[in-house]
């Protein structure tokens, strides 16, 4: 049995014998190798808008949403954060307590926490030559509601987890065209990880993700 204990900005995920993952805050120095907090933007408009979006019992991801892309922050993302490149602003909402998989892109991803949430992260440099990855290397980070973060392209990540069994809502910004259907030509060994456009995914076998490469070794971490 794994439970959580929230103390200030820190949380521990524990089982009865040992600590599985120590959760820091994205405001802590330990997050800097995975990403950065974008402190100079106002997220209040888009967080309030997300109040009207459902929080299903499973997890739903929408790559681009018309209402979210009609916000001021979407313009800021295109003009400033992504340096004039077109982006898509969507969301990932629902209930999730497991790691299940890790993915990466060739570009940074921006997340805006519309509720408190947890991200389980790793580094691409720890992926082995056979594209396996030890889940013991995963680190967890608490993201307070309203916080905008840039997750670097070198960071392994996946769907957020809720805090203390609650659901989560997360705005997701990526370069336009990411996470769409793709024809995999298997030109390189890495192509077996290609799950969608600009999305390389390593799954845990316990997650039973159809068509995914099951390269996560160790526990399928539960928050």
Q: Can you say where each PLM-predicted feature lies in the sequence?
A:
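Conserved metal-binding segment of the jelly-roll/cupin
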Residues: 143-163, 173-175
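Single conserved hydrophobic/aromatic residue that forms the stacking wall/gate
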Residues: 1-13
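Short, conserved secondary-structure segments in the cores of folded domains
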Residues: 2, 137-139
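N-terminal, charge-rich interaction modules
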Residues: 14-97, 220-223
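Extracellular-facing segments of soluble proteins and assemblies that are Gly/Ser/Thr-biased and enriched
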Residues: 67-134
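Accessory, usually C-terminal, subdomains that scaffold auxiliary metal cofactors
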Residues: 162-223
């Amino acid at each position: 049995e794994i439970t959580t204990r929230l103390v200030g900005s820190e949380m521990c995920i524990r089982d009865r014998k040992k600590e599985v993952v120590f959760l820091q805050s994205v405001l802590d120095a330990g997050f800097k190798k995975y990403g950065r907090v974008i402190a100079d933007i106002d997220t209040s408009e888009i967080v309030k808008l997300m109040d009207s979006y459902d929080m299903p019992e499973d997890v739903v991801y929408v790559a681009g949403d018309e209402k979210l892309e009609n916000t001021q922050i979407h313009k800021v993302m295109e003009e400033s954060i992504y340096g004039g490149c077109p982006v898509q602003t969507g969301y990932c909402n629902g209930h999730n307590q497991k790691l299940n998989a890790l993915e990466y892109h060739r570009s940074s991803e921006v997340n805006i926490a519309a509720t408190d949430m947890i991200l389980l992260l790793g580094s691409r440099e720890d992926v082995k030559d056979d594209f396996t990855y030890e889940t013991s290397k995963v680190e967890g980070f608490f993201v307070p509601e309203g916080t905008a973060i840039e997750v670097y392209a070198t960071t392994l990540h996946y769907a957020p987890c809720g805090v203390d069994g609650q659901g989560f809502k997360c705005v997701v910004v990526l370069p336009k065209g990411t996470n769409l259907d793709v024809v995999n030509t298997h030109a390189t060994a890495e192509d077996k990880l290609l799950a969608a456009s600009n999305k390389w995914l390593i799954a845990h076998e316990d997650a039973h993700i159809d068509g995914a490469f099951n390269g996560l070794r160790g526990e399928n971490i539960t928050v």
